[in-house]
Curated annotation (Swiss-Prot):
It comes from Arabidopsis thaliana. The keyword Ribonucleoprotein does not apply. GO terms for molecular function: DNA binding. Keywords: DNA-binding, Nucleus, Repeat, Transcription, Transcription regulation. Residues 120-176 are annotated as: Disordered. Residues 133-144 have a biased composition (Polar residues). It is found in: Nucleus. This is Putative B3 domain-containing protein At5g46915.
Length: 288
């Protein structure tokens, strides 16, 4: 069946080449079942890469380190392999051609390494020139502008100081509130239901005795050989993050199971997101 897709015809012609170069900017070849091609988007273009069959045969399994997805007509490089190839060869946005060849002698690799090092050093020199240019421009400000800038900085520092004091008061209040709500042990019993496979929502009467903020609980297994960090969300009154892992590894199953949960605080609030570290023991009693 004849085709009128010019992009596909180009692909068929490229297949017979010993080297490899394809940049399809606005060509739609999906209608020809070329759906396994990789797209490389960092150049702002939809770049598709195809390897001719004869070219791929020139590699051995040990030489070709890129992943290859086989297609009845073409061999396409996987995205991770292509991106590594681009990084190793320092191909930038101005590089319009990329050529692939079988492994080259060490002399060629050494020259490529020198080229990459030259490009890196050149980029660092350009950055240094920009910094020097900006600093020289800043040095031309007038005395009036300097005075105005100092006044603005002083006003901003005063505002930040007041804001930090207000934040410190709020933090202290929250810590006191969390400590008061969890200073005594909390105990409750619940029948394990299917909903508990995903999170454990506690009763309202128990929720009033729990921390009001996000809290991390360290849950120990009765045998003492394993523990889990489970996140308690005070606003929802439920154990969420890490709970599914606990259910799977404990293990807990739906059935005639009763949870006897004992909760007690072991320390103050940590500096990370005001998360209080607490201890929780989960004991299972099965009737079979």
């Amino acid at each position: 069946m004849a085709t009128t897709n010019p992009g596909y015809l180009r692909c068929k012609e490229e297949r017979n080449n010993k080297s490899f170069f394809m940049v399809l900017q606005s060509v739609d070849v999906s209608s020809e079942n070329l759906v396994e091609s990789c797209r490389y988007m960092t150049m702002g273009l939809a770049v598709k890469r195809a390897l001719p069959y004869d070219f791929v045969r020139s590699f051995t399994d040990k030489e070709l380190s890129l992943g290859i997805s086989k297609n009845p007509t073409f061999y396409y490089m996987e995205k991770s392999g292509w991106e590594k190839f681009v990084r190793d060869n320092t191909l930038g946005t101005l590089d319009g051609k990329e050529m692939m060849q079988p492994p080259q002698p060490r002399a060629f690799l050494a020259s490529s390494s020198r080229i990459r090092r030259f490009r890196t050093e050149q980029g660092e020199d350009d950055k240094k020139e920009e910094v020097v240019s900006e600093s020289s421009n800043r040095g031309r400000t007038t005395a009036a502008e300097s005075v105005g800038r100092k006044l603005k900085l002083g006003k901003k520092a005063a505002e930040e100081s007041q804001e930090s004091k207000r934040t410190e008061k709020v933090v202290r209040a929250r810590r006191d509130e969390a400590g008061a709500s969890s200073s005594t042990a909390v105990e409750f019993t619940a029948v394990f239901q299917p909903a508990y496979l995903y999170n454990l929502r506690i009763r309202s009467s128990v929720k009033d005795q729990m921390p009001v903020e996000k809290t991390i609980f360290k849950v120990h297994h009765p045998n003492g050989k394993k523990f889990w960090n489970v996140v308690y969300l005070g606003s929802y009154g439920a154990f969420s993050g890490g709970w599914q892992c606990l259910v799977k590894e404990y293990p807990l199953v739906v059935g005639d199971i009763y949870l006897q949960v004992y909760i007690h605080q072991t320390g103050g609030a940590t500096s990370s997101c005001l998360q209080t570290l607490m201890m929780m023991d989960v004991r299972v009693r099965r009737n079979y």
